[in-house]
Amino acid sequence: MAFLTKKKKFKFQTSFNLEELTAVPFVNGVLFCKVRLLDGGDFVSQSSREEVQENCVRWKKKFNFVCKMSANSATGVLDPCVCRVSVRKELKGGKTYSKLGFADLNLAEFAGSGSAARCCLLEGYDTRNTRQDNSILKVNIGMSLLSGDPCFKTPLSTVKTVSPPGQDSSLQMTCKGEGTVRSAGGTVRQNRSRQAMLSSGVFDETEQNLSSPEETPHSGHSRNSSQASQQSKISGHSSEHSRCSSMSDLTHRRNTSTSSSVSGGLSLTAEGTEPERDVKPEKPPRPIRPPLHPDRHSRRKKDSVESQPTWVDDTRIDADDIVEKIMQSQDFSDVSNNEDSHLRLFVSRDGSTTLSGIQLANRISAGVFEPVMIEIR
């Protein structure tokens, strides 16, 4: 039975891409990383030294190395193979450095998955005396099998999913859209895919329309606003209820199409939906459009789309109307050919000259200026 305790050996060609470090708590500085295999090899390498720009450092450095792994022969699960990425900052012009933090990555989780990206928070070396930063390191890891049994299992992922505050912990990635879940006590609970929409009040109206189990005449009836109308699998479902549900969908356009599914041979009659119709608020009336200009349609194209009045055309000022108003406000009937209305040249006795029209000529006293006539030859 010694062969059962012997572990399987594997070799993987690893492509480790060091992408970037975001949310760096420094405005300037030079950072670099040291990549080292803690298990399955002796690979050690450093990245290039890059400056901090807009609280972000981008290395775009690729490391290629071979790592060795082992797996239990009974279960086939790969043993951990940790690769540590240490982020460091240059000090004294590059002579020394300080360690900002590190991130440990289990390469066994990436075995056989092709290329996968991972973002992880930096862990501090001295968490007692230094404050931990929220810098996020992004890497891209790809692994391919070189030797060993191709049948193996990867360990469970250590990635932790953090849900926003106030979000229901029962919501998982498999829950899609909206739905109603019946608990053991018989109460109906509605799932929401996004808790943020509830806080903003988007679904306030739909929550009011959902009736509680005490208000509904039959406890086996539940409504789902995200699905289409379903046909009952029970032979006792009447056609009158289907006509009633379709009429309620047409009259209330703000709500999505509803459906009803009956369990246990119970059916919902038309009288049960009447109180729900009274609770729903009516759609507010649309504001009245301003009257159109009588000459507006003559200037438009006669296409089928542009011939219909739109809100943009009603609120837009027509340039032709402004030109017509300006032309009508001007008086072009008084056309005078009198020479006194033009500019006149006056020369005084001391040789000074002045230009003026008829208004200044009337105010000038006689003898001070003499008019000069210039003839065209």
From Swiss-Prot:
It is found in: Nucleus; Cytoplasm. Residues 2-145 form the C2 NT-type domain. Its main location: nucleus. Residues 160-173, 188-198, 222-234 have a biased composition (Polar residues). Residues 256-269 have a biased composition (Low complexity). InterPro entries: EEIG1/2-like (IPR039931), NT-C2 (IPR019448). The keyword Nucleus applies. Residues 274-285 have a biased composition (Basic and acidic residues). Keywords: Cytoplasm, Nucleus. One of its GO terms (cellular component) is cytoplasm. Residues 160-313 are annotated as: Disordered. May be involved in osteoclast differentiation. PANTHER family: EARLY ESTROGEN-INDUCED GENE 1 PROTEIN, FAMILY WITH SEQUENCE SIMILARITY 102. Belongs to the EEIG family. This is Early estrogen-induced gene 1 protein. It comes from Xenopus laevis.
